[in-house]
A protein has these predicted regions:
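Conserved flavin/dinucleotide-binding core of flavoenzymes
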Residues: 5, 12-22, 308, 314, ...
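N-terminal secretory signal peptides
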Residues: 1-42
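Mid-domain catalytic core of redox enzymes
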Residues: 294-414, 442
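Active-site/ligand-binding neighborhood in enzyme catalytic cores
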Residues: 30, 195-300, 307, 315, ...
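N-terminal Rossmann-like FAD-binding beta1-loop-alpha1 element of flavoenzymes
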Residues: 74-99
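Glycine-rich FAD pyrophosphate-binding loop
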Residues: 92-114
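Dinucleotide-binding Rossmann-like beta1-alpha1 core, especially the glycine-rich loop
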Residues: 118-189
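N-terminal export signals
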Residues: 39-41, 46-67
Length: 534
């Protein structure tokens, strides 16, 4: 499971390298065999994951259809993203009424679909890719009658451009194969998934070691070093000197992260909702017994004398206070640091540590429209490209099922780290031009077909979540020290009848950073609130 194509590619490299080690098969043959095996697994996985999703929804008490209001709201849910909406849904299934508050003017949070900009196609400003193992997302898409398109079924190959030239997948696998051998001693000494509450001294040592230092100290080859740099920078949104080496090691050791198993049942499939991923948010919002209270920015949390939770909101410049039996806060991690937690809350040390310490990546997305699909029509590429160029890191084709050869197509330019942070939506044409110039190096002869208006302006949209005042970041980055200092803390109750949810509160070993993680964290927090109030 991964947010980006390049991370999926590394997973495939890991699996292929392991197969070469076991069998002695040449890298080029193993690469071809790996590609052929992907299609064979699709139907069986889809059936199994659909059943798993239904079971998860039933276990958390989720329901279909509009819930009925039952007097005053028992639980406040702050944030109308996936976590908050699903928490309210699960609470309704447990016969608890929730009031959802949202600082912005819409539901969905960082799941935000863009319609009407690219003719005939819906693209994603934020979360886009849905994995086979994202059972809850897929079950909800079925519940709301939405259509999943499979990006992996698109024809063509991926392009890799590093150190001034194109490379084959087999060449990357060869260097990865050598590097995996160098990691074996470290993998043997790591514990079974370290957390802030349970880890050994070696876990701590490698957790504090930046990924950049680890790659250099373990002798990563020059090509692999550049590929890893790009892959992890865009996957977690920070430069690799700001990431823990354990993020790599638990990627490589499949049994440490059961849903992300490059040597076993890792999924190479990725899906998108044709109608737009935020249609799930619309479906969940439509089921709520109480309308979402938009324009409510949480500024302070305190307790009343009888132990209830008092929330103070800024609503158009005036303060509005509400009191609830319990509260679930689902704000993005950077926004949690702006809340004033009164001493009466008695916030536990683990909660304060999580709030103060968790880091977010600086990812951006820029979508570019084309008059056709020249990456395939001219070069045989499926839309996936990766490089170490200054204005290009990773691309994929967005909404391919609604594209048309010779007519229309959309490429997503996905970035992280320093480039992701600096991209400026106010300078859209400048940013698009710089990207297209580097893309021409990766895909020669294709960028002339970028869609332009009569004045030569490129059809494009740029989203930088760091610059959005309601989010101030993309999603969780596992910085040095995260695993042994923070992992597991955010999911714990924040004192009596106060709980946290959101992708950042889910475990790294589950679905942290994904829509699935947001949904499951909402279900977990709702269950915690229900148990506290029953």
């Amino acid at each position: 499971m991964a947010r980006t194509d390049l991370f999926r590619f590394l997973a495939r490299c890991a699996r292929t390298a392991a197969h070469c080690e076991r069998t002695g098969m040449p890298e080029s043959e193993a690469v071809e065999a790996s590609r052929e095996s992907i299609a064979d697994r699709t139907g069986r996985r889809r059936l199994l994951q659909g059943a798993a999703g239904a079971a998860a929804l039933a276990a958390f008490g989720a329901h279909a259809g509009k819930s009925q209001a039952q007097g005053p709201a028992d639980v406040a849910v702050v944030g109308a993203g996936f976590a908050g909406l699903y928490a309210a849904t699960v609470l309704a299934g447990k016969k608890l009424t929730a009031q959802v508050y949202e600082a912005g003017s819409r539901s969905g949070g960082r799941v935000a679909s863009l319609r009407g900009v690219f003719p005939g196609q819906t693209v994603e400003r934020g979360a886009e890719l849905i994995d086979t193992t994202h059972s809850t997302v897929r079950q909800l898409s079925r519940q709301f009658g939405l259509t999943l398109e499979n990006y992996e079924k698109q024809p063509g190959e991926e392009f890799f451009y590093f150190s001034g030239r194109h490379w084959s997948e087999a060449e990357v696998v060869a260097e990865y194969r050598a590097f995996v051998g160098a990691m074996n001693d470290d993998l043997q000494r790591l514990s079974g998934g370290p957390t802030a509450d349970s880890h050994n001294a070696f876990d701590r040592e490698l957790d504090l070691m930046p990924l950049s230092t680890y790659l250099d100290s373990r002798g990563a080859g020059p090509l692999l070093r550049r590929v890893m740099d790009t892959a992890y920078t865009i996957e977690f949104g920070r430069e690799i000197d700001r990431q823990s080496s354990l993020a790599l090691l638990f990627f490589a050791q499949a049994n440490k992260r059961a849903h992300f198993a490059p040597f076993g049942n890792f999924s190479d499939e990725r899906f998108h909702i044709v109608e737009g991923n935020d249609a799930i948010a619309g479906g969940l919002e439509g089921q709520l017994a109480r309308a979402v209270a938009f324009g409510h920015r949480l500024v302070r949390v305190s307790r009343t004398a009888d132990g209830r939770i008092k929330l103070a909101f800024d609503v158009g410049g005036r303060t509005v206070e509400t009191v609830h039996a319990a509260a679930i806060l689902t704000l993005p991690a950077p926004m949690m640091r702006e809340i004033d937690f009164d001493a009466s809350v008695a916030l536990p040390a683990h909660s304060r540590t999580a709030i103060d310490g968790l880091d977010y990546g600086t990812n951006s997305k820029m979508m570019i429209g084309f008059t056709g699909r020249p990456w395939f029509e001219r070069l045989g590429c499926n839309g996936g490209s990766y490089s170490d160029l200054p204005n290009h890191q990773n691309t994929w084709e967005t909404a391919p099922s609604t594209a048309a050869f010779g007519v229309r197509g959309v490429i997503t330019d996905y970035s992280g780290g320093n480039r992701g942070a600096r991209l400026d939506p106010a300078k859209l044409q400048t940013e698009a031009g710089a990207f297209l110039q580097d893309l021409e190096t990766v895909w020669p002869g294709t960028t002339a077909l970028a869609s332009r208006d009569s004045q030569g302006r490129v059809l494009a949209h740029l989203e930088n979540w760091v610059r959005n005042p309601l989010f101030k970041g993309a999603y969780t980055n596992n910085q040095p020290g995260y695993f042994t200092g923070l992992e597991g803390h955010y999911a714990k109750p924040a004192g009596e009848r106060l709980f946290f949810a959101g992708e950042h509160t889910d475990s790294f070993y589950n679905y942290q950073g994904f829509m699935e993680g947001a949904l499951l964290s909402g279900a977990r927090a709702a269950d915690q609130a229900w148990r506290a109030l029953r």
